[in-house]
Structure formats: C-alpha cells, structure tokens
A protein has these predicted regions:
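Structured alpha/beta or helical-core interaction and ligand-binding surfaces enriched in interleaved
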Residues: 1-158, 163-191
Length: 191
C-alpha cells in the first residue's frame, strides 16, 4: 500500500476500487442537490485580480472545503478519489500554462491520476482539490461509499451532491451547510 506523506494527518492510502458502475450511475440523475453561495466565480479569479478579490475567493473556497470535510466527518465515512471517480474522463484540465500555478503543482505533485485513494475528513489534499476544481484546473470528485454519495466541487464555486439516498442524507447535509454563513443548499432539476 502506497502512503503519500505530505498531506493530512492520516495521509492518503492507495486503494483498489471496484464499484465503478455504481458510481457512474449516480452521474445520470435528473435532479441533484447543490451547495451554493451568495457569491459566484466562474473558474476562479481573473489573472489581474486584486488582493481583495483573491482573499474573497479563498475565503469562499475555505468555507466549501470546511463543509466538505464536515460532511465526510459527520457521515463517518472516508472518501474515495481518483481515476474511477469522476464525471469527466480526465482528472486535470489541459491548459498550456498549468505548471506556472502553485495550486496545480501542489496537487499534481502528490496525486497520481492513474490511481484511486481513500482519504479522511482531515486530509489537507481536500483543500488543494477544492481550490483546483474551483479554478478549473482539476475535476476530482469525492465518493462516500457507505452512503453511495458523490460530492463534486465545480468551477462555478458550488458542490453538486449525487445520491440515491437523498431522504437519508439531506437533512444532515442541510444542518452542516446551515452552520456556514453565506452558503445554502438547493435542489436542481435537469432537462
């Protein structure tokens, strides 16, 4: 078992994940719950963003990261991330200048996109994933196997919740989200 030693308290453990079809079915839901906020960024902040704009973006990213960590913790689960968890076939975007961004390099250095990992609620890599997903550099989703639930942070500063068990999970998630000012949860239906 490979253990990555830079991130988190318990570190990421490489795992052999077998429930790929179960996960893929969740992405075909006609309606999902979404954790969203009062503010919105499309792909992060602009290259010429002021320090105030960056501060605002990162404070929001931190709120979302804390909510996601709290969901993993409150549900008493570990999250699976990696090559078999994701709506997109690629886990990283393809920008020519990606390697000039520290946030991307920090994630790419520790995350092998050809593997799956089990992470705990307190693993610091969650912060890097949220930042990179919000900035449109990565497309890494979190799967909680006990509840057959996917948490997908998007480049639109929101987290989609895919599940077959909304009745069982949503009230607890609403309580978690409600503890963070400026964030809320809503239901979206797709055509």
């Amino acid at each position: 078992m490979l253990i990555l030693q830079k991130f988190g308290i318990d570190y990421m453990n490489k795992v052999n994940f077998k429930d790929i079809e179960k996960v893929k079915k969740l992405y075909h839901k006609k309606g999902v719950y979404v954790i969203t906020g009062e503010k919105y960024w499309d792909g992060g902040y602009d290259i010429d963003a002021s320090l105030d704009e960056k501060l605002q973006f990162y404070s929001y990213a931190k709120k979302y990261s804390d909510v996601l960590k709290n969901i993993i913790y409150q549900f008493g689960d570990k999250a699976i991330i990696g090559k078999d968890i994701g709506e997109k076939s690629d886990l990283f975007a393809h920008w020519k200048d990606m390697k000039c961004y520290d946030s991307f390099n920090n994630l790419n250095e520790q995350f092998n996109k050809k593997s799956n990992y089990e992470i705990n609620h307190n693993d610091e890599i969650i912060d890097y994933i949220i930042e990179n997903n919000f900035r449109y550099f990565s497309f890494i989703d979190f799967y909680l196997p006990k509840y057959n639930m996917i948490l997908q942070a998007t480049c639109h500063t929101e987290i989609f919740i895919y599940s077959d068990n909304y009745k069982e999970i949503i009230s607890k998630i609403e309580t978690i989200v409600g503890s963070e000012s400026e964030l809320n949860i809503k239901y979206l239906e797709f055509d």
